[in-house]
Design a protein with these regions (language model features):
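Divalent metal-coordination and catalytic microenvironments
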Residues: 33, 57, 83, 115, ...
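Ordered, amphipathic secondary-structure segments that act as subunit-interaction surfaces
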Residues: 106-118
Length: 204
């Protein structure tokens, strides 16, 4: 299976190219960055790698939460370890989210985990078939999709969203609590944050 995937993905990588020309938006960010460093804007953000509050937060990558979530919780740079993905969920028992949580716990001193989903989440009601069609429309070769399916990739479980946000939070918390590599003394909490007001509702 690994050989099958590596052969197929190798072909994918061959047809990809890295853009050496920045878009106007990237240029704007780079210009801002130069001024930020020149004016020593970084000084107020200096901290170390250890989270002061000993908390890791798993949340969604939704743009509405970028500034809202920290502001609503009163957290600043250096307070917590923030892990984000689409939906704030765990899709694999040994994937990047669990790996990040293990690093946070065993290497960085995290003692509590907060799973924070949000209202009106884009991952809710997301369907793999629709996304696969969008991939094909953007030029992804259907043969790659078929090859990956043949090699064991379950696109439905990987790309499908969830129907019930509260149920998703409960499932994610349960997944973490019962994971064999997560210590039993680590406290795990589940919440839903309002994407507009920032109000937090405890689920677990």
């Amino acid at each position: 299976r690994d050989f099958c995937l590596s052969r197929g993905l190798g072909d994918v990588y061959k047809r990809q190219c890295v853009s050496k020309q920045n878009s106007a938006m990237i240029e704007e960010m780079l210009a801002y960055n130069r001024e930020f460093v020149k004016n020593e804007g970084y000084k107020e953000y200096i901290t170390n790698k250890y989270p002061d509050k000993k908390i890791a937060i798993l949340s969604c990558m939704d743009t509405r939460l970028t500034a809202l979530l920290p502001a609503a919780l009163g957290i600043k740079n250096g307070d917590v370890k923030m892990i984000k993905n689409a939906g704030g969920v765990i899709s694999h028992p040994f994937g990047s989210v669990i790996r990040s949580l293990l690093v946070a716990i065993f290497e960085l001193g995290v003692e509590e985990i907060m799973v924070i989903a949000h209202s009106d989440c884009g991952a809710c009601h997301m369907h793999s078939e629709e996304m696969l069609e969008k991939m094909k429309a953007r030029g992804i070769n259907a043969d790659y999709i078929h090859m990956m399916s043949f090699c064991g990739v379950d696109f439905h479980s990987w790309l499908d969203g969830f129907e019930d946000t509260e149920k998703s939070v409960r499932g994610t918390v349960d997944f973490i609590v019962h994971h064999p590599l997560i210590p039993s003394d680590v406290k795990v909490h589940g919440f839903i944050i309002d994407s507009t007001t920032g109000e937090l509702t405890r689920i677990v």
